[in-house]
Curated annotation (Swiss-Prot):
UniProt gene name: rlmH
Function: Specifically methylates the pseudouridine at position 1915 (m3Psi1915) in 23S rRNA.
Residues binding S-adenosyl-L-methionine, per UniProt: 104, 123-128
Gene3D superfamilies: 3.40.1280.10
HAMAP family documented for this protein: 23SrRNA_methyltr_H
Subcellular location as annotated: Cytoplasm
Designated name of the protein: Ribosomal RNA large subunit methyltransferase H
Pfam family, one: SPOUT_MTase
GO molecular function per UniProt: rRNA (pseudouridine-N3-)-methyltransferase activity
Organism: Nitrosococcus oceani (strain ATCC 19707 / BCRC 17464 / JCM 30415 / NCIMB 11848 / C-107)
Amino acid sequence: MNIYVIAVGQRLPRWIGEGYQEYAQRLPRQCSLSLVEIAPARRGKSGHPTQWRQDECRRLLAAVPPNSKVIACDERGQSWSTEEVARRLQIWMNEGQDVVLLIGGPDGLAPLCLEQATGLWSLSSLTLPHGLVRVILAEQIYRAFSLLNRHPYHRAS
């Protein structure tokens, strides 16, 4: 199974890429994590956030591999515990279907992206920088995989 993080944003601070890679490279091939970056919409004086989100959404959805399960990261989604992430990861691995995690840009995801998703995942009730979300997702996927495989990285009480 492959997990794709398809995210709006390029040329982010180096620490974001390093943080993401730290966790992505720890995962084995049977649960690989790949990042696909989408250029943000051009934000000019004549544009509007709704137009920018729609443009980014079209390009995000165009990057989704066929027959993938799509989960959109959105503050209005469901909050999952670490154990719930592990449970879902196990289901995804059993199904053998690739999974896509969508991350919007600074203005979030357009309604079409949310409608096309099979699920909405809220990482926090806080508003998080979209670059930081990449690192959090990679760490949580690695933590869930560690939990499923009884690796000492995850220390539950």
